[in-house]
């Protein structure tokens, strides 16, 4: 591929996204979220009071100037597809802008679905080639972060890389869940191990390991060549982290891109924000952090908005019930269509159309859309799934044994409540 001559960074920031296509891998099940992903893919899980997890990757693309996007789906895709069709249909076909939905179709390899993340792209190569992009940006659809991909594209081009991997230091104890890399003084990746049992630490800090974020930029022709070779390799697991990136590393073609260089944040002195909300505790904690006085993730940055499907809902309402009890909230996010009647909500996140009846106390809870809470309930350190009806007088989050018997209780004490669990109680 012909390299661009050295140009002004602002010019490159405008040009490179137009030469790129983003592919969002959104077919993951998210098994560590337990029953929260029983009926939806992890990227379709609600987050932050009104969003879905995939909205962050999609918004990053739009804000970075990338308006050619493919979303690769597989597991429980209906909710995700519906959300994208309703909330992300504003692209201009005349301007060659689009969000293409690329579901698993069992088009090759007999009856198999996608065999891995790399195979998910391989099975759609005929479509992807038609985009005629010079650069392909591979993204995971299940992380919470704000990143300017145009800055990473500039880094990719200026280094003369054929593959660039976004990376971030993480505690060694957490690095087992990531691909871990080593780099030289020129940011070339010299070693890469996917999810090692004993992650190697960084030379400059033995408490941290340099982790891959699952965000890659490839020269398009180089990526197609790699995927075609991988497809013919019967011993491959057809995964970017396990197969493609190690191969690129050992051929000397991979470079690292430090996430702080392209992370978008209001406070330049703050730690770069990136979360894998793949466990119930991580999901619960990341939601509640948004309700704090100074959240780590700034959702109010008008220069980098997070977009989503906007429903026509009335404002949230806090009312006094007939007994004189006031509906009150503190340090919480309360979305449109919610009604809090004579109850107290503290340090919680309420998604649209939640109804909390009188004499309730809700503390450190995440209530997904359409939850109905009966009178005199107490909810603490819990996640209530969509459309659950909490019976009058129910107490959740105060008795560990009772919570574990009736619902799912994590080792950290976070209680997940779903409609099926409630139905079993009344059976």
Swiss-Prot record:
Pathway(s) the chain acts in: Glycan biosynthesis; glycogen biosynthesis
Question: By its UniProt entry, which InterPro entries does this protein fall under?
Answer: ADP-Glc_PPase (IPR011831), ADP_Glu_pyroP_CS (IPR005836), GlgC_bac (IPR023049), GlmU/GlgC-like_hexapep (IPR056818), NTP_transferase_dom (IPR005835), Nucleotide-diphossugar_trans (IPR029044), Trimer_LpxA-like_sf (IPR011004)
* Residues that bind AMP: 40, 46, 52, 130, 386
Q: What class of enzyme is it?
A: transferase
EC code(s) of this entry: 2.7.7.27
Q: What Gene3D superfamilies does the record point to?
A: Hexapeptide repeat proteins, Spore Coat Polysaccharide Biosynthesis Protein SpsA, Chain A
For this protein, the record's Pfam families field holds: Hexapep_GlmU (PF24894), NTP_transferase (PF00483)
What is the catalytic activity of this protein?
alpha-D-glucose 1-phosphate + ATP + H(+) = ADP-alpha-D-glucose + diphosphate
The name of this protein is Glucose-1-phosphate adenylyltransferase
Organism equals Cronobacter sakazakii (strain ATCC BAA-894)
């Amino acid at each position: 591929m012909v390299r661009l001559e050295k140009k002004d960074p602002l010019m490159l920031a405008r040009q490179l996204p137009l030469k790129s296509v983003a592919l969002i891998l959104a077919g993951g099940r998210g098994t560590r979220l337990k029953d929260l992903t029983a009926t939806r893919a992890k990227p379709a899980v609600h987050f932050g009071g009104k969003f879905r997890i995939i909205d962050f990757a999609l918004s990053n693309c739009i804000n970075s100037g990338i308006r050619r996007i493919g979303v690769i789906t597989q597991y429980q895709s209906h909710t995700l597809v519906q959300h994208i069709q309703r909330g992300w249909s504003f692209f201009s076909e005349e301007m060659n802008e689009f969000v293409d939905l690329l579901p698993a179709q069992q088009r090759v390899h007999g009856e198999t679905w996608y065999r891995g993340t790399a195979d998910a792209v391989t099975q759609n190569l005929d479509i992807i080639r038609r985009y005629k992009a010079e650069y392909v940006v591979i993204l995971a659809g299940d992380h919470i972060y704000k990143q300017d991909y145009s800055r990473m594209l500039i880094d990719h081009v200026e280094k003369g890389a054929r593959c660039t991997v976004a990376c971030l230091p993480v505690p060694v104890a957490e690095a087992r869940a990531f691909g871990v890399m080593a780099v030289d003084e020129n940011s070339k990746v010299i070693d890469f191990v996917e999810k090692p049992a004993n992650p190697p630490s960084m030379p400059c800090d033995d408490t941290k390991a340099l982790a891959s974020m699952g965000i890659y930029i490839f020269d398009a022709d180089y990526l197609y060549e790699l995927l075609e070779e991988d497809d013919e390799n019967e011993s491959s697991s057809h995964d970017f982290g396990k197969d493609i990136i190690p191969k690129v590393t050992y051929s000397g073609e991979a470079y690292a891109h430090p996430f702080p260089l392209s992370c978008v944040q209001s406070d330049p002195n703050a730690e770069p924000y990136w979360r894998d909300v793949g466990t119930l505790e991580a999901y619960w904690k990341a939601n509640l952090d948004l309700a704090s006085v100074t959240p780590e993730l700034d959702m109010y940055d008008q220069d980098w908005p997070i977009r989503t499907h906007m429903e026509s809902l009335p404002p949230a309402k806090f009312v006094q019930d007939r007994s004189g009890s006031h509906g009150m909230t503190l340090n919480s996010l309360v979305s449109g269509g919610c009604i809090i009647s004579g109850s107290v909500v503290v340090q919680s996140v309420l998604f649209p159309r939640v109804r909390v009846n009188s004499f309730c106390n809700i503390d450190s809870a995440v209530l997904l859309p359409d939850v109905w809470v009966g009178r005199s309930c107490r909810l603490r350190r819990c996640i209530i799934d969509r459309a659950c009806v909490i019976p009058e007088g129910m107490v959740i989050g105060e008795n560990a044994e009772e919570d574990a018997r009736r619902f799912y209780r994590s080792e950290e004490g976070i209680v997940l409540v779903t409609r099926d669990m409630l139905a079993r109680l009344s059976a």
